C-alpha cells in the first residue's frame, strides 16, 4: 500500500469517526431532551427496556446505558426480551449480546406465536392481537421485576405514522404518547426515542453492528396500512426536506380553538364581550399565512456541528 492510499484511508476513517460521533451526540441529545420534557426517568427508577432484537430497541438500550454514565441521578436498567416462540427464532443472539455488554436482563418465554396463529385466519393482520398479548406479558414482567418505568423503542416516525393512520382509518387526531400510564394505573410506559429520526437510528444501528433479529410474525406481512403510510412519509421526506420535522413540531403546537372538538374547547360558551387569552379569534377572517418553506429543517441539511447539550434535567422522586 503506497503512502497516498494510506493517507486517503486515514482521512476516510477520520470522517467516519467524526460522522458517527456527531450522530451519537444527536441521538443522545434527542433522547435526553425527551426524557427532560416529559419527566420520563426520575431518581431511583428501575427502567425495563423492552428489547425485541430490532434496530430501534437496540439503539434505545445503547443510548440509555450511555446516558446513565453521565446522568446526575441514579437509575437502574434491566433489558427484557419476550421470546414468542416463533419458528427459527435465534434464541442465543440476545443473551450473548446482553452478557457481552454486562447489562442485567431477563428472557421471558411465552408462546404468543402459537396463540396468534390459532386465533387469526391465514392472511389476516396479526398485529392487534400480538400487541395485546405482548402488552399483558410485559406489564406482568415489569411488576415481577419491580420496574417503575417500561421503555419502548418507538421513534418520531412511528408517532407520525400513527397520527396519519388514526386520521385516515380511525377518524381521530391521535398519535403515540411519549409517556402514558396503564389503564389500571400500575405501569408507566415511556418512549425515550420520541424525538429521534428513524434514519438516524438506522445509521447508528449499522455503525454499531447490532445483531439484528428480523420479525417473521408481523413485520413481514405485506400490504399493511402502516407500511403504506411509512412509504408516503418517506416520499415526502425526499421530495420536501423539512416537512417531516415541521409536521412533528405541529404535534407539539396545538390550537384547540381552531379544531372542532367541543369537549376540548367551549365553543357553545363563546359570548359577545368575552376576551379570551391565548385564543386566536381575531384572525378568523384572515387568509392563513403558510410559509413557502418548512419552519423546521432536517438537521442533516444544516451545516452547524452540534456539541454536547447542557446537563439533562432529570427529576428526583420525592
Curated annotation (Swiss-Prot):
Residues annotated as binding [4Fe-4S] cluster: 127, 130, 218
Family statement drawn from the similarity comment of this UniProt entry: Belongs to the TtcA family.
Function recorded in the entry: Catalyzes the ATP-dependent 2-thiolation of cytidine in position 32 of tRNA, to form 2-thiocytidine (s(2)C32). The sulfur atoms are provided by the cysteine/cysteine desulfurase (IscS) system.
Organism ancestry: Bacteria, Pseudomonadati, Pseudomonadota, Gammaproteobacteria, Pasteurellales
Cleaved signal peptide residues: none
Subcellular location per the Swiss-Prot or TrEMBL entry: Cytoplasm
Motif (PP-loop motif): 52-57
UniProt subunit comment: Homodimer.
Reactions accelerated catalytically: cytidine(32) in tRNA + S-sulfanyl-L-cysteinyl-[cysteine desulfurase] + AH2 + ATP = 2-thiocytidine(32) in tRNA + L-cysteinyl-[cysteine desulfurase] + A + AMP + diphosphate + H(+)
Gene name of this polypeptide: ttcA
Name of the protein this chain belongs to: tRNA-cytidine(32) 2-sulfurtransferase
UniProt organism field: Actinobacillus pleuropneumoniae serotype 3 (strain JL03)
Entries under PANTHER family matching the protein: AMINOTRAN_5 DOMAIN-CONTAINING PROTEIN, SULFURTRANSFERASE-RELATED
Superkingdom of this protein's organism: Bacteria
Alphabetized HAMAP family for the sequence: TtcA
Other notes: The thiolation reaction likely consists of two steps: a first activation step by ATP to form an adenylated intermediate of the target base of tRNA, and a second nucleophilic substitution step of the sulfur (S) atom supplied by the hydrosulfide attached to the Fe-S cluster.
Cofactor requirement: Mg(2+); [4Fe-4S] cluster
Metabolic or biological pathway: tRNA modification
InterPro entries: Rossmann-like_a/b/a_fold (IPR014729), TilS/TtcA_N (IPR011063), tRNA_Cyd_32_2_STrfase (IPR012089), tRNA_thiolation_TtcA_Ctu1 (IPR035107)
